[in-house]
């Protein structure tokens, strides 16, 4: 049988060790070590027709009609169309074992777990694994059963080799040969009249001994592809050596009539029987063998050498030679032409035998196909039921996990929102307390300043009353100095206020930037995975707490510094007040010289302070320019590095795209060349592809169902 199995799916192995007439054609190297049978041949039982189909109906002159349904041909690997085929030729022993066990060969093929998952995408892995284990256990049990049945078939063949034929069977075979010899006028008449009226019983053949039984001894059953069973070969050689004294010139041959006497009924019964593949072929006709009676034929193979060297074939060839010599006036026919004629006659006889065997096999396989379809429907219903249960359980689990995850996410979001609100509330309270403290300190300082000024004015008024002119002059000088000091103090206070405002603005800008960055980070993390959001929020919360603690420490430090500055200003003011009182007393005693000296000292101090302020401003501007230049240089360096990296990446991308295009063009050219080569070979061989055969089989099956 020819299995239309692609080379990549061949398993190249049988149910057991190869023996007798197993034949494997063109099995790829990666499948030679397989232990499983080449059971993919069952795909031809209900899926596709065989590739090399023997034109059997032509041999009968159109008298036998082919079956309209798909059928299985067990003996189509002898035709010339099957030679050179890429597909597996399975063993008749393996097929017979499958037929006896009511197992389709495709059921012995191993299937991957991915195939079961792909058949039903909704099934869970647990259900798929259970189905896979059940299928694998059932497959191994069927495989073991078929192997045991095949071993039993081989043992029956060995027993037949050692069992001598009875004299009654030998006499019946000789009588049938003598009766068929006169009626064989041509190759067609010989082949049609060589079948007996009824099959000879095996018990009668075993009962009576006869010297002619050696002529009916079969030759070694050799494989058609050159692979022979060494055990059967050695047994047949020993058998042939033991009977060589009685066999004569044709000791290792069968006649066509003796082969037909082995099991099969007359051709009239086979010709009048129902076509293979029809519904009526499921029942056995009175003269047709069932699947269990196919053992003698499907268990062994008869080569052309057995048929071409039989005495009947030799007599037929001699008669044809005499007729040709008489009609054409030729002197003689070469031995090579005689052998060719004998081979042609033997081939015709074997085709008739194979036709009878095929007719019986078609009926049995059609019955097996119907049973297999019913079993497959039951298995499919059970599989769909298990699949639906697994799908419902899986959907319930998924819904439960989805609800639990949603609740956890909502709870985490509410918890994060509460933490954020609490942190914002703490920050606002801290800012309010700090503002209140700053206002209180400013009011206290202003109140103390007013009290100090009032006290100074009262003291000055009392001293003015006692000191008159000098005091008035001193008061005038003091007021001028006080005005200058007030202006200087106002400038200092304005400077301090501006610095405080700048610091507050910078702090507020930094805080806003942090808040904006925080908001942007939260938005980006919310768009990402929720798991990474929790980790990022934790880190951001820690950073925010660190920032709040740092800002609190800075505010405390600034408050401490302001308080220290206030104390220092107060001490400086008190010190200045004491110095001023001493200076006023010295001025009152010393006069104009001391007053001029004080004026010069004050002017020098103001000038020095102005110079220091100008120098500090110049240094700050210089530092700012240096920082700006450094930042610009860093930006230029980063920009150049980025441009260089982009250029290198573009070059690499272009290089990869060129390589990809060249590889794609090379692959396309190779594919086009392969396609044209295959098309040329297909045109020359005029063979059908596997896909086309599958489509034709599906089309014929659909038309037959309609």
Swiss-Prot record:
Key words of the record: Coiled coil, Phosphoprotein
Highest taxon of the lineage: Eukaryota
Phosphoserine modification, residue list: 310
Region (Disordered): 1-47, 183-292, 374-393, 398-425, 453-580, 607-634, 656-689
Residues forming coiled coils: 362-604
Compositionally biased intervals (Low complexity): 38-47, 183-214, 242-257, 664-674
A Pfam family this chain is assigned to: DUF4659
Biased composition (Basic and acidic residues): 374-391, 453-483, 490-513, 542-580, 617-634, 676-689
Cited PANTHER family: COILED-COIL DOMAIN-CONTAINING PROTEIN 177
Name of the protein described by the UniProt record: Coiled-coil domain-containing protein 177
């Amino acid at each position: 049988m020819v299995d239309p199995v692609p080379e990549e799916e061949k398993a190249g192995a049988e149910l057991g060790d190869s023996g007798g007439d197993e034949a494997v054609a063109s099995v790829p190297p990666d499948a030679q070590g397989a232990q499983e049978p080449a059971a993919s041949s069952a795909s031809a039982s209900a899926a596709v027709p065989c590739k090399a189909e023997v034109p059997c109906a032509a041999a009968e002159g159109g008298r036998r009609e082919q079956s309209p349904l798909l059928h299985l041909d067990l003996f189509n690997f002898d035709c010339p169309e099957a030679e050179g085929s890429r597909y597996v030729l399975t063993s008749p022993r393996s097929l017979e074992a499958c037929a006896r066990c009511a197992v389709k060969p495709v059921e012995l093929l191993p299937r991957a777990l991915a195939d079961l998952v792909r058949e039903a995408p909704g099934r869970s892995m647990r259900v798929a694994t259970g189905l896979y284990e059940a299928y694998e256990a059932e497959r191994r049990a069927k495989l073991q059963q078929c192997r045991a049945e095949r071993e039993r078939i081989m043992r029956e063949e060995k027993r037949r080799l050692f069992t001598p034929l009875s004299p009654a069977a030998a006499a019946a075979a000789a009588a049938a040969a003598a009766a068929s010899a006169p009626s064989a006028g041509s190759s067609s008449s010989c082949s049609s009249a060589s079948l007996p009226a009824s099959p000879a019983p095996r018990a009668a053949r075993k009962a009576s001994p006869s010297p002619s039984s050696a002529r009916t001894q079969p030759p070694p059953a050799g494989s058609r592809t050159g692979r022979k069973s060494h055990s059967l070969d050695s047994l047949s050689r020993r058998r042939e050596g033991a009977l060589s004294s009685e066999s004569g010139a044709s000791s290792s041959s069968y006649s066509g009539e003796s082969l037909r006497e082995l099991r099969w009924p007359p051709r009239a019964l086979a010709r009048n029987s129902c076509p293979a593949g029809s519904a009526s072929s499921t029942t056995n006709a009175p003269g047709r063998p069932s699947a269990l009676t196919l053992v003698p034929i499907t268990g062994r193979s008869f080569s052309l050498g057995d048929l071409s060297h039989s005495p009947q074939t030799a007599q037929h060839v001699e008669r044809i030679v005499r007729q040709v010599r008489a009609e054409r006036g030729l002197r003689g026919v070469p031995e090579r032409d005689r052998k060719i004629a004998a081979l042609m006659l033997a081939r015709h006889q074997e085709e008739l035998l194979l036709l009878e065997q095929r007719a019986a096999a078609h009926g049995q396989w059609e019955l097996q196909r119907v049973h297999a379809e019913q079993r497959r429907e039951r298995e499919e219903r059970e599989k769909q039921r298990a699949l639906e249960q697994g799908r419902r359980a899986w959907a319930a689990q998924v819904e439960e996990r989805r609800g639990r995850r949603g609740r956890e996410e909502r709870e985490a979001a509410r918890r994060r929102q509460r933490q954020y609100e609490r942190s914002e509330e703490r920050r606002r309270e801290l800012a309010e307390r700090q503002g209140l403290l700053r206002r209180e300190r400013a009011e206290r300082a202003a109140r103390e300043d007013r009290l100090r000024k009032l006290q100074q004015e009262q003291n000055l008024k009392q001293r003015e009353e006692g000191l008159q002119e000098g005091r008035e002059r001193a008061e005038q000088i003091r007021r001028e100095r006080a005005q200058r000091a007030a202006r200087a103090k106002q400038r200092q206070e304005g400077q301090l206020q501006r610095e405080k405002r700048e610091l507050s603005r910078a702090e507020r800008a930094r805080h806003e930037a942090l808040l904006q960055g925080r908001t942007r980070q939260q938005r980006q993390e919310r768009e990402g995975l929720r798991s990474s959001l929790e980790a990022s929020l934790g880190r951001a919360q820690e950073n925010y707490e660190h920032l709040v603690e740092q800002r609190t420490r800075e505010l405390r430090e600034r408050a401490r510094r302001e308080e220290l500055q206030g104390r220092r200003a107060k001490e400086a003011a008190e010190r200045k007040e004491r110095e001023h009182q001493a200076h006023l007393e010295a001025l009152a005693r010393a006069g104009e010289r001391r007053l001029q000296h004080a004026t010069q000292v004050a002017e020098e101090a103001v000038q020095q302070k102005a110079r220091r302020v100008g120098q500090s401003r110049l240094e700050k501007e210089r530092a700012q320019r240096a920082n700006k230049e450094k930042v610009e240089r860093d930006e230029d360096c980063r920009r150049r590095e980025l441009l260089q990296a982009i250029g290198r990446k573009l070059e690499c991308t272009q290089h990869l795209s060129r390589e990809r295009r060249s590889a794609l063009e090379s692959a396309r050219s190779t594919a086009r060349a392969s396609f044209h080569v295959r098309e040329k070979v297909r045109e020359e061989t005029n063979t059908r592809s596997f896909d086309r055969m599958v489509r034709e089989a599906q089309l014929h099956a659909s038309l037959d169902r309609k």
